[in-house]
Swiss-Prot record:
Enzyme Commission number(s) of this protein: 3.2.1.96
Outcome reported for the amino acid change (mutating residue 174 to A): Loss of activity
GO biological process: carbohydrate metabolic process
Catalysed reaction, written as an equation: an N(4)-(oligosaccharide-(1->3)-[oligosaccharide-(1->6)]-beta-D-Man-(1->4)-beta-D-GlcNAc-(1->4)-alpha-D-GlcNAc)-L-asparaginyl-[protein] + H2O = an oligosaccharide-(1->3)-[oligosaccharide-(1->6)]-beta-D-Man-(1->4)-D-GlcNAc + N(4)-(N-acetyl-beta-D-glucosaminyl)-L-asparaginyl-[protein]
Active site (record annotation): 174 (proton donor)
Single GO MF descriptor: mannosyl-glycoprotein endo-beta-N-acetylglucosaminidase activity
Gene Ontology CC, one term: extracellular region
Entry keyword Hydrolase: yes
Signal peptide (from-to): 1-42
UniProt protein name: Endo-beta-N-acetylglucosaminidase H
Variant or mutagenesis effect after changing residue 174 to D/Q: 0.05% activity
CDD domains according to UniProt: GH18_EndoS-like
Length: 313
């Protein structure tokens, strides 16, 4: 039996940038829409058959461009299909008692330099998502006090996607520390209102669920179930197999989760093989860094796509 491993580096949740916070806060407060910066149409990527592969990147320490360096030896397709910027935060303004979207200086740098840090991946055919994470301040996806408050935060998210030309948003309900700063505990309506509003704002973008925290277990309220508003959901425990508890088809689920460089290659391969054997359509990886991870990536590409991976330095 695999031992659950949860080693996400928390510096993305802890490193604060007042300037970035003020910029986002003032935009939200004024109600001004961000100027759209649409992603360019990707160049036709070599066709590959098999599950969608996902790479989370800790941008406090690593470059998003590493995701595009790995391709398949057979056919030249991308080893990774989705790259996730880890991570923006949901913060709490104690003065206005409202949640707001916050970017630390490293996330802000990636977004500000989208032309060089994001567009090359998109032009290669890789989707780029923004992960949003709690920040120990009591604000989270599961404790908005009203539909209006949830919708206001959804607008901040969709404005950021439009402004920076992203392909979608990933929800990760960790480190919120509900109750801090006098905030409320999770309620049943909050996440439903948030996801409903976000999907209405960006009907053609990706919304994914890191299947953890109070939000992940509160997907229905008042006769509304938001499960089908997600494009993907994945297991959050690296080195394990756990089917996300959400009503999505197998093609949109990743029961497998691995941490590159920490999960053994044999386990990486076993989980990839099981993904194919049991008909699941997504394979999640975390913490791709700037080292040569060809052997680690090949451990799953052999099973998912029948090919070794190659790395372009």
């Amino acid at each position: 039996m695999f031992t659950p491993v949860r080693r996400r580096v928390r510096t993305a949740a802890l490193a604060l940038s007042a300037a970035a916070a003020l910029v986002l806060g003032s935009t939200a407060a004024s109600g001004a829409s961000a100027t759209p910066s649409p992603a360019p149409a990707p160049a036709p990527a070599p066709v590959k058959q098999g599950p969608t592969s996902v790479a989370y990147v800790e941008v406090n320490n690593n470059s998003m461009l590493n995701v595009g360096k790995y391709t398949l030896a057979d056919g030249g397709g991308n080893a990774f299909d989705v790259a996730v910027i880890f991570a923006a935060n949901i913060n709490y303004d104690t003065g206005t008692k409202t949640a707001y979207l916050h970017f630390n200086e490293n996330v802000q740098r990636v977004l500000d330099n989208a032309v060089t840090q994001i567009r090359p991946l998109q032009q290669q055919g890789i989707k780029v998502l923004l992960s949003v994470l709690g920040n120990h301040q009591g604000a989270g996806f599961a404790n908005f006090p009203s539909q209006q408050a949830a919708s206001a935060f959804a607008k901040q998210l969709s404005d950021a996607v439009a402004k920076y030309g992203l392909d979608g948003v990933d929800f990760d309900d960790e480190y919120a520390e509900y109750g801090n700063n006098g905030t409320a505990q999770p309620n049943d309506s909050s996440f439903v209102h948030l996801v409903t509003a976000l999907r209405a704002n960006m009907p053609d973008k990706i919304i994914s669920l890191y299947n953890i925290g109070p939000a992940a277990s509160r997907l229905s309220y008042g006769g509304v179930d938001v499960s089908d508003k997600f494009d993907y959901a994945w297991n959050p425990y690296y080195g394990t197999w756990q089917v996300p508890g959400i009503a999505l088809p197998k093609a949109q689920l990743s029961p497998a989760a691995v941490e590159i460089g920490r999960t053994s290659r044999s386990t990486v391969a076993d989980l990839a093989r099981r993904t194919v054997d049991e008909g699941y359509g997504v394979y999640l990886t975390y913490n791709l860094d700037g080292g040569d991870r060809t052997a680690d990536v090949s451990a799953f590409t052999r099973e998912l796509y029948g090919s070794e991976a190659v790395r372009t330095p």
